[in-house]
Amino acid sequence: MGIYEELVARGLIAQVTNEEEIREMVNNGKATFYIGFDCTADSLHVGHFMALCLMKRLQMAGNKPIALIGDGTTLIGDPSGRTDMRQMLTEDAIKHNAECFKRQMEKFIDFSDGKALMLYNSEWLKPLNYIEMLREVGACFSVNNMLRAECYKQRMEKGLSFLEFNYMIMQSYDFYYMFQHYGCNMQFGGNDQWSNMLGGTELIRKKLGKDAHAMTITLLLNSEGKKMGKTASGAVWLDPNKTSPFEFFQYWRNVDDADVLKCIRMLTFMPLEEIDKMAGWEGSQLNEAKEILAYELTKLVHGEEEAEKAKAASKALFAGGGDTEHMPTTELTNDDFGGGSIDVLTLLVKCGLAASKGEARRLVQQGGVTVNDEKVTAIETTFGCEQFTGDGVVIKKGKKVFHKAVLV
């Protein structure tokens, strides 16, 4: 089985410009491909994780990845999938975010000896002359066609700035520039990028009379059709300081039964033959599959040692074994205990398990809070500071969120 057939079998391919030519290129290690990453945050998240895994798979098959850091396009802002205009970042913030991205990407992609490239599109976008850009590139784009693009159609009613309207041209120019200067013949991206990617292949065809290719990656959706990779508190990040290895592990450990095998197939590097054998698993076997998923992905992102720690902490919660050392923890001081105690509502807010005392009150009243295996039913419940010494207390929110609080 070639790498293209494997990508199809794993359900990773959504759309392609020319399946036959793309198959021949990637199966024979002839693709120099790029994926762009705009620097809108100081960490990559689960959505980027799929792209990084795809780059790793294709590199292992002999193809050459280009990780394009969009420090230039971030100054414009991608309207794809947005109902409002992105917050504009300063150049210093973008530079900081780009450095964070670089450190995380190096865990997945081998950049040694020219096996992969990391490029910054500000290097060619910033020096562009506006009039020259309009004449040389703008003339190749039809406004009528651009307005039919899904990313723009979604924004027309609420307003689309001229700044954002230029994003497709900028992304297309990236592909055109790298095709000329780095031999980049293929672009990969999320399904919401399809219009922008076609803009690049068309620009190359019109300006150079040559063919380039595009392929989109299937969005990671749960069985209800909602994007995965987000929790009630926000995105699931790859930075351990934003989403701890334990929280990352728990996110995947708690996926729905209907989604676990799809996630294993799309995200892990387990052989397809092994995954196919799991197709008939049910009941307790599905819990085993979830643990395999969580362990494999945590190992990929955070390393084997952190994956083992997260697994041990998870077992402490679900099987009564292991330890709680690596559970997300809030450190309390004596100042937090007025009169030597702390009430449950304040405790929930301090630990970040509720955004406000009002939300904490609702959690308790709905029976969603357990402390050290005892359900809290009264909002007036208090805990003495002595309970938080030693191993501290374990707070459970709902069925799947665990947190430890200790006195320091």
Give the label of every model feature segment.
Residues I204-V408:
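Conserved nucleotide- and phosphate/pyrophosphate-binding catalytic cores
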Residues R10, T90-E91, N97-T216, N222:
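Divalent-metal (Mg2+/Mn2+/Ca2+)-assisted nucleotide/phosphate chemistry catalytic cores
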Residues N28-G36, P65, S172-H181, L221-N222, ...:
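Short, hydrophobic/aliphatic alpha-helical segments
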Residues A51-L58, M178, N196-I204, L297, ...:
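Buried hydrophobic packing segments
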Residues E21-P79, F188-W194:
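N-terminal catalytic cores of NTP/NDP-binding nucleotidyl/phosphoryl-transfer enzymes
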Residues P79-K95:
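A charged helix-plus-loop insertion that forms the helical arch/lid used to bind
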Residues G77-G81, L128-L134, K226-A232:
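Short acidic, glycine/serine/threonine-rich loops at helix termini
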Residues M1-F33:
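Positively charged, low-complexity intrinsically disordered leader regions
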